[in-house]
Curated annotation (Swiss-Prot):
Keywords: Cytoplasm, Membrane, Mitochondrion, Mitochondrion inner membrane, Transit peptide
Range of the transit peptide: 1-11
Subunit structure: Associates with mitochondrial complex I assembly intermediates during its biogenesis. Forms a complex including sicily, ND-42 and Hsp83; the complex is necessary to chaperone ND-42 in the cytoplasm before mitochondrial import; the interaction between sicily and ND-42 is direct and occurs preferably between the unprocessed forms in the cytoplasm; the interaction with Hsp83 is direct. Interacts with ND-30; interaction is stronger between the unprocessed forms in the cytoplasm.
Domain of life: Eukaryota
Natural source organism: Drosophila melanogaster
Protein name: NADH dehydrogenase (ubiquinone) complex I, assembly factor 6 homolog
Entry's localization field: Mitochondrion inner membrane; Cytoplasm, Cytosol
Gene it is expressed from: sicily
Length: 334
């Protein structure tokens, strides 16, 4: 293990360093600071100092830690753009989550993100508030340097228009939601890698659904009654279980166990379908799918806990995940 820790990427994973060292490793050039910065040059100087990139990395590290680890292991030339996209996704998600957010306020926030996407695709000659927001500034830089599909970015926002208290009717509806959110982000990362491949797109679609369903399952004990559990109504009716029983998730409730099993099985099916396409996915972008490692690890812990969402092994961080990710990265597998 000590030999592995000498590797730059591995040190980043296990030490979770930030600031100058990580930003430099991410391929972002740093300039010496000046004592006096003219007002009109603050944005330019901030970009030179990598503030926007550091801000994006910090956001992802704080709110999306597993994907933060996965992004650290991407090729250097993809890392900055990947952090920008993941930070944008974090910001959109945070804008509609939390305690007692009024629907009208959530709608206004999403409208802001919709407008911001359009601003990021405007020519550099048209200045706007994008330059003053670090995440949007990084997103605009990514849009300007990569050929990104605006449709995928819009999906990340449009999907969040769904009220958090609105339950899914069926597993298919749940899969459509996760494809809009998680799969769209993976497809954007493929575009950052410059890959146009049908098999890679199919793998991204299946993996996004698997990761999304697993993430929504993990959120049930944390969200409580703030949002409807992700268990579809058709599954609840099949096993005669109420949403309240899902939220409580008692260890001796067989009906709840069966409901969680059905939904987790859907995630596992998509994960297997994604991995079946492994050899057909171009080798240079396989690391984009490292999130499959974290998804697989969670589903396995959930299985061993008899699908009890509140089991201690299912609510805490996976301390072995950095080692698993690094090993899969060395093998270039997901």
């Amino acid at each position: 293990m000590r030999r592995l820790v000498r590797n730059w990427n591995c040190r980043l994973l296990f030490n979770a360093k930030s600031g100058q060292e990580i930003v430099s490793h991410a391929g972002i050039h740093q300039e010496a600071k000046t004592n006096a910065i003219p007002r009109e040059k603050k944005v330019i100087e901030a970009d030179k100092n990598g503030y926007g990139a550091k801000h994006c990395m910090s956001l992802v590290e704080k709110y999306d830690y597993e994907n933060y680890l996965c992004t650290l292991l991407l090729p250097r030339e993809l890392r900055r753009a990947a952090f920008a996209l993941r930070a944008f996704n974090v910001e959109v998600s945070r804008s509609v989550s939390g305690h007692q957010i009024e629907p009208q306020i959530a709608k206004m926030r999403l409208k802001f993100w919709h407008d911001s996407i359009d601003k990021c695709f405007e020519p550099d000659s048209q200045r706007s508030y994008v330059e003053d927001q670090p995440v949007l500034r990084e997103l605009k830089h990514t849009v300007g340097s990569r050929k990104l599909n605006k449709v995928y970015l819009r999906r990340l926002v449009t999907a969040r228009e769904r009220p958090p208290t609105h339950a899914f009717e069926s597993i298919r509806e749940l899969e459509e939601y996760t494809e809009q959110t998680f799969s769209s982000l993976l497809l954007l990362l493929l575009e950052v890698g410059g890959v146009r491949d049908l098999n890679a797109d199919h793998a991204a679609s299946h993996l996004g659904k698997a990761q999304g369903i697993a993430t929504l399952l993990r959120s049930i004990p944390l969200a409580g009654r703030q949002q409807a559990p992700c268990i579809p109504l058709e599954v609840l009716v099949l096993h005669g279980v109420s949403q309240e029983r899902i939220i409580r998730s008692k260890s001796d409730d067989k009906g709840v166990e069966d409901c969680i099993f059905d939904v987790a099985s859907a995630a596992n099916t998509h994960l297997k379908l994604a991995r079946q396409l492994h050899d057909k996915v171009p080798p240079q972008v396989r690391k984009i799918f490292l999130s499959a490692v974290a998804t697989d690890a969670y589903l396995e812990r959930l299985r061993r806990a008899n699908f009890l969402l509140t089991h201690k092994s299912c609510v805490g961080r996976d301390t072995l995940l950095p080692a698993r990710l690094f090993w899969k990265s060395l093998l270039n597998r997901f």
